[in-house]
Curated annotation (Swiss-Prot):
InterPro entries: IGPD_sf (IPR038494), ImidazoleglycerolP_deHydtase (IPR000807), ImidazoleglycerP_deHydtase_CS (IPR020565), Ribosomal_Su5_D2-typ_SF (IPR020568). It is an enzyme of class 4 (lyase). The keyword Amino-acid biosynthesis applies. Gene3D superfamilies: Imidazole glycerol phosphate dehydratase, domain 1 (3.30.230.40). Coiled coil: none annotated. GO terms for biological process: L-histidine biosynthetic process. Its EC number is 4.2.1.19. It comes from Pseudomonas aeruginosa (strain ATCC 15692 / DSM 22644 / CIP 104116 / JCM 14847 / LMG 12228 / 1C / PRS 101 / PAO1). This is Imidazoleglycerol-phosphate dehydratase.
Length: 197
């Protein structure tokens, strides 16, 4: 089996980012983004997706977190697209429900080659630890556009905003793990009747 690893660098006037991933990892993670709450959520992706993930970012945090969060989503999406390659033999679809105390979220993903995001999370607060929760929409939109996936995110219940967000990211990691897993029964075939994705 070919290694499913990728490293991507993105440099703009707003951010300088390096992302390295191993889709067949064990959940090892290292983050240096300057945004601690974002690091905490990236750790959920790594641990629950069993994806080795290394993210470094120097961003214009003196303005706010927006460019850093969005550009990390973009760069992570690019790394996924590069690491997964032609998608032959993958399960393609992934889904997960994850609870955390009173909160419950569902994430469904399709490595379809068609970017689309439906995110329905009725946050009960505007920020957590000074982090603007609206920025998670920017993160996921960047990821979706560059990984070329369809992603549905629903927080089904919850009143603690931290719990709402954490269940979303844990479910996202688990849905990714399912979708990118190689299916031996596919025998390297494309998971589409079209013959391509």
């Amino acid at each position: 089996m070919a290694e499913r690893k990728a490293s991507v660098a993105r440099d703009t006037l707003e951010t300088q980012i390096k992302v390295s991933i191993d889709l067949d990892g064990t959940g090892k993670a290292r983050f240096d983004t300057g945004v601690p709450f974002l690091d905490h959520m990236m750790d959920q992706i790594a641990r629950h997706g069993l994806i080795d993930l290394d993210i470094e970012c120097k961003g214009d945090l003196h303005i706010d977190d927006h460019h850093t969060v969005e550009d990390i989503g973009i760069t992570l999406g690019q790394a996924f697209a590069k690491a997964i390659g032609d998608k032959k033999g993958i399960r393609r679809y992934g889904h997960a429900y994850v609870p955390l105390d009173e909160a419950l979220s569902r994430v469904v993903i399709d490595f379809s080659g068609r970017p689309g995001l439906q995110m329905h999370v009725p946050f009960t607060r505007a920020s957590v630890g000074g982090f603007d929760v609206d920025l998670f929409m920017e993160f996921f939109q960047g990821f979706v556009n560059h990984a070329q996936v369809t992603l549905h995110i629903d927080n089904l219940r919850g009143h603690n905003t931290h719990h709402q967000i954490e269940t979303v990211f844990k479910a996202f990691g688990r849905a990714l793990r399912m979708a990118i897993e190689l299916d031996e029964r596919m025998a390297g075939q494309m998971p589409s009747t079209k013959g391509c994705l």
